[in-house]
Amino acid sequence: MCGIIGINSNKEVTSTILNSLRKLEYRGYDSAGIATLNSGYIQEVKCEGRVDNLEKNIIKNKLLGNLGIGHVRWATHGIPSTLNAHPHSSDNVSVVHNGIIENSTLLKKFLVKKGHRFKSVSYTHLTLPTSRS
């Protein structure tokens, strides 16, 4: 289970996403994360634990942006960790996900043969290589 929020605005969205994640925290408190688009670059801050921990990291990393996604996670696959926390990002895309990718083992084997490397055991990480053009 998890909680997901996304916002696109002409104003800074980080604090709004953070406040929304606080309201969604009952859906997952094992890890939390936010990714924003700022000046054409994806910035990502994640942590193990509750949204309060995430807020400290956001302040430390000065996360800003007018487009962003956030996620709180209840770990059902993979241990609670910063590495397994969402969002998962590449250079040009950031993804959050709720649920199970049924053919994840087969998909991962296929992508590893193609040379892809994975940082986490989260199902969501499998979608990043396939989203690149």
Predicted feature residues:
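N-terminal glutamine amidotransferase
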Residues: 1-105, 109-113
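Conserved glycine-bearing catalytic or ligand-binding loops at nucleotide- and phosphate-handling centers
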Residues: 116-122
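Conserved small/polar residues in nucleotide/adenosyl-binding loops
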Residues: 124-130
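Ser/Thr-glycine-rich phosphate-binding loops at phosphate-binding pockets of nucleotides
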Residues: 72, 123-124
